[in-house]
Amino acid sequence: MIYQLTRFLLLSVSLLFAASGNASEREELHRLLDEHWARAQQEQIFFRTDPDAYRPDGRLAQVDAEARNRRRAFNEEMLGRLAAIDAEGLSGQDRISYQLFRYERQAERESYDYWDHLFPITSLFGYHTYFAHAPANMAFSGLQDYQRYLVSLEDFPRYNREHIALLQQAVDKGYTHYCGSINGYEQTIADQLVEEARQSSLYQPFERIPSTVAAAQRQQLQQQGLALIEKSIIPANRE
C-alpha cells in the first residue's frame, strides 16, 4: 500500500542514517509522524492510498462534510507544526522525511479544493465494490478479526447513505459524470443484490473460519454475518 510504504520510508530514519541534527527538531518531527499515522488509522482514511487495497477494519470511515472538514483542519494543523520545525536542524533521513511529509500534506491541502469526492462511483467500480471485494483479500486469523468485520458490516448502511448524499450534492451543484464513465454503473450494484445472503461475497469469510475459533463461536459468527448481510447490507444496496 502506497501510504504504508511512504510511512515506512518516513520512520526508517535512525536505521538508514546516523542523524546528528538537533534532537528537539527530530523529536517533534517524529511526534508529528506518529500522530498523523494514529489519526489516519482512527479516520480510516489514508491519503493517496490505492483504493484496490481497501480493507475495512471495524467502524468505516465517515465521508460527510463534518468529517471532511475535520480532516482538513487536522492537515492544516500538521502543516502549521511542520512550519515551526527548523529543517536546517535535521540531518540525513530526517530531512528527507520532513520534505516528503510536507509534500504529502501540501498535496492533501490542495486536494480539498477539488470535487472528486462527489463522484464515488463509476461504471467499473466504487466505494460499494471496494467494500464487497475486500474480504477476498483479507486475513481472518482469529475471533477479533471477525468481530471487527461484523462492526464493518453493521456500519455499511450509514457509510452507504453518506456516499449517496455526496452523489446528491453533486447533482444539486450541477456536477455530472461524463456519460461514458457512468454508463452501466447499475450493474455494479445489481451484482450485490443476491437472493440469498450466503451468495454474497461478504459472507465468504464466514465459510473459512479457522479452527482456532471455537465451534460454538463459529456458528454464532455465521449467524450474525448472515443476519447483517440480509437485514443491513442488501437493503442498503437497494437504496
Please tell me what each predicted stretch does:
Residues 1-4:
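N-terminal secretory signal peptides that target proteins for export/translocation
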Residues 7-17:
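Bacterial N-terminal signal peptides
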Residues 20:
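Phosphodiester-processing cores and adjacent nucleic acid-binding clamps
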Residues 23-239:
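N-terminal maturation segment of proteins
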